[in-house]
Amino acid sequence: MKKLLSMLCALLTAIGLPGCDYVNVKELQPGVSTAVEVRQRFGPPQHEWRNEEGSVTWEYSRQPEGAECYMITIGRDQVLQSIEQVINEQTFARVERGMTPEQVRRMLGRPASSQYFQLKQETVWEWLMERGSTLNDPTYFTVSFNPEGRVVGTGRYTKLRP
């Protein structure tokens, strides 16, 4: 039964449904699980970030529909070092004025959307923070970039449902 659930989760993840992320994360163990096991559970990463000490961080963003982005770090020995869900208040607080789009993407993963505002001369990226439910509306975290590609501010808003 456990093997069937794992296979179903892998299939759903491969087609972009994050419903099994909870199970996948719980069954992976830093210091024990291998890069092969991570790929079996999560599929290929959307982006690979090379780290100075030789490890690699794989990005698994569930944006725009999901409110998760997993940064999974694999050591040079091909063993899982860490799994971090980066769509959270601690990571948002690390976004600073003057950062580049690449630095922000490295911290938060692929944004749910990007929009250019002609009058303000700003590009705004947004990430879904909370999906919302029948009682709550979805909430987004935003990062604004100036024409030089530097962070000029952050914010959040709630998208009211009709």
Predicted regions located by residue number:
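Sec-dependent bacterial lipoprotein signal peptides
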Residues: 1-18
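Residues within mature, well-folded domains
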Residues: 20-162
